[in-house]
Amino acid sequence: MIRLILWNNVQSLVFKRCLFVPSNSLTNKRKRRIPPSKPRSSNRKDGDIEPYRMTDQNQTPNTGSIARLPAEVKKELKDLRSFTKVIAQHLKPEQENDSLTSAEKPDTSQLPPIDIEEATDDIFGEISGTKKLSANAVPPPPPPPPPGLDIPDEIKERLGLLSELLVPAKTSNNKLPEKQVENNWKLLLSQLDQAGGLSGLSKRSVSKFFSKIPPKNLKNLIPMIENMYNKAEMSIPHPIYYMFVRSLTLGDKISDSQMQLINKYFQEISKQTDLKIDHYETMILAYVKNNHMEKIDGILAQMKKKNIEISKMIYTSIVRGYIFYQKDHQRALDTFDSMKFLSQKTQPDEKVYTDVIVSCVMHREIERALDLYYELKDKGMNVNQNLLSTLAKGCSRSKQFKTQAWNFLFQVYDHGWVPNLQTYEHMLYIAARDGDVELTRVLFYKMLQTNSVTIRAFRYLILSYSKYVPPHKRKEKHLILLNHKGQLFRQNILQDVDFSKPVHGFPFLPSSHIPDSKFVLAESSAIWAHTVMNNPSFLRQQTLVASYVSIALELGDFTEFKDRFDSASYLNTDGIPKVREIEIIEPRQDEPTEKATTTEEQITSSEPDTNSLIRSPILNQLQQNINDNQFKAPRDSYLYNLAIKAAGKFKDYSFAQQILHERGQFRKSNSFKLLSPKQQNQDDFQFAGYLVECWTNMNLLEDAYAVVLSSVDRFPWSWRELGVLNNAAMKLGSLELAEAVRKVAQVTQVKHHGKIKRQDFKTYVMKRGY
């Protein structure tokens, strides 16, 4: 019989085996005939053990051990079964969290979730017409086995079978949930701690064992490892501390508490050894992700005292910190130039070039971005897909280089790359910004088919509606039509889509051709109603609401604009002091006016509603049933600029007064107070410029000039804002007002824009002599 013995009454997987052979005198019962032996069946129940019976006629009985055998075996079997149950619970993944065993049925009424791995190939196949059958697809090679398989022998001997049981083996399918692998390491360390911990183990084996833990899992196991070192009364060596630091620096951001731990570990490392270049590189990377760039100068000073050269990785971390964390474009460019001209070792690679080009595109320096792109190509560096798509997006924003936008996108196909999700989003953005609604709708339809719709893509679709220009008013061709490849691309993809077959219930009108602006207004209203019902979280973005409201501003009337403005946005009153207002309404003496108003209302109600054709009836029902702001976005400065612009365009004085009053309330809110003083002043100046234009469109020139005169010392007025007022004054024959406006422009140009005065220029010419 196989006997299982517990060591010191502690559950462990260290097994001792002994063979006990009973004699024939164990029982007084008559012997039963033993049938011939058969092959053992491998189908056993969990925890069942079938003992072998062996007989020996010459063996003498041991009555003392025989008496204790049944009780000990029962206890040992009970303990073994309970321990096996514990291990099974750790090994068994949760069904609701297992991405391999659970299959969630998609909801066709909602925009589908993104599957980035399959979306790019599917969209590329749909657009290019080269989509292959799934049966002919070659399966991808299996991923490499996870780390942590090679455990030192003395630790493996202490753990027993648990080291092979919990760590995943090399199989054809290693797509195990990440949570399961993390729990394996946690259970492995806890079992090692119960089996004696680190006492008696060599430091080399312990360090080798801990080095096998993946950094993502090590980040959460640091307290347990420190506790094991303390129990064994062993000092933590500096390589282990450095492993802790490397695991804590994973991710895009580092919290202040994590930064305190990192500083503590670096102090422990410095007590055991001198800090080397690797330590300083990781330290600077940690401060960059913690957004404390000001402390980097002190670290660089320490390196200078120790005669440690600044490495290329340190420069790269500093450049990325200025670009993505500090948003300091100029200092990023200065550091980038230092990398190029300092030494050959610090020459920037294609990743640094890509980051700097992205920063130039973000700050609308397209010409500098193109210069860096051609410089990168001259040095023979590789060009990646994200760089080309970013340059295409940047060129579409520039009047000078917008014709090159689609050229960069088609270079992605020239390289033979499958466009990724970012490339498709930039493709949507370029078509939307150009006002090519037909192409934008088709690209979005393809993304619906491949379940790769993002909120950014949805925002670009609404943007295309706001940039739409009717064919009889459009003076320029679409940018894609200026390229021969673009003409073929647009023609083929428009013919390939049938809008009469909706995908996921998305309410595209069944036509690929856009006849007029009413089509755009109607479809945008239907899409907004569909999004309110299925994806209300999309509607809380202010940029999306601004594009939705701009559609009515450019293509609709005042009624449609005000309806969209009120139904899609609201004033966030957080931080606004509550003031009690009392309105006194005095009764009018002329009663016939009431009858006149009622007759006017009857006449207007009898007239047909022109907005009924362009407004979704479902949206009307939703707005009647929804009274809160859960489907609206809080208003910001840009939305108020659009509102005051609409008041001037449609010449609605009461709406302008309403927006002017509400904008004053908005300045008292927390959302406005959280802005920097520079941003607040910039937003106020933009609103003042639109207010001047609004009063000018209503022929209220004195009110417009009063706005300018009241803020002449605060805002840098220029001809860009005052040109409309000056031209209107000239048309109405108000020469004095036009002269006053010109004087304001001259004074502010000298004060804010650095232009020289006329008298100073004459003095300069006289001194110069020519």
From Swiss-Prot:
Keywords: Mitochondrion, mRNA processing, mRNA splicing, Repeat, Transit peptide. It is found in: Mitochondrion. One of its GO terms (cellular component) is mitochondrion. Residues 43-53, 588-598 have a biased composition (Basic and acidic residues). GO terms for biological process: mRNA processing; RNA splicing. PROSITE patterns: PPR (PS51375). Transmembrane segments: none annotated. Signal peptide: none annotated. Residues 55-65, 599-610 have a biased composition (Polar residues). Residues 28-67, 90-114, 588-610 are annotated as: Disordered. Residues 1-90 form a transit peptide. InterPro entries: Pentatricopeptide_rpt, TPR-like_helical_dom_sf. PPR repeats lie at residues 276-310, 311-346, 349-383, 384-419, 420-454, 636-666. Belongs to the CCM1 family. Regulates mitochondrial small subunit maturation by controlling 15S rRNA 5'-end processing. Localizes to the 5' precursor of the 15S rRNA in a position that is subsequently occupied by mS47 in the mature yeast mtSSU. Uses structure and sequence-specific RNA recognition, binding to a single-stranded region of the precursor and specifically recognizing bases -6 to -1. The exchange of Ccm1 for mS47 is coupled to the irreversible removal of precursor rRNA that is accompanied by conformational changes of the mitoribosomal proteins uS5m and mS26. Binds to mitochondrial small subunit 15S rRNA. Involved in mitochondrial-nuclear incompatibility, a major determinant in reproductive isolation between species, through hybrid incompatibility of Ccm1 and its interacting partner 15S rRNA between yeast species. This is Mitochondrial 15S rRNA processing factor CCM1. It comes from Candida albicans (strain WO-1) (Yeast).
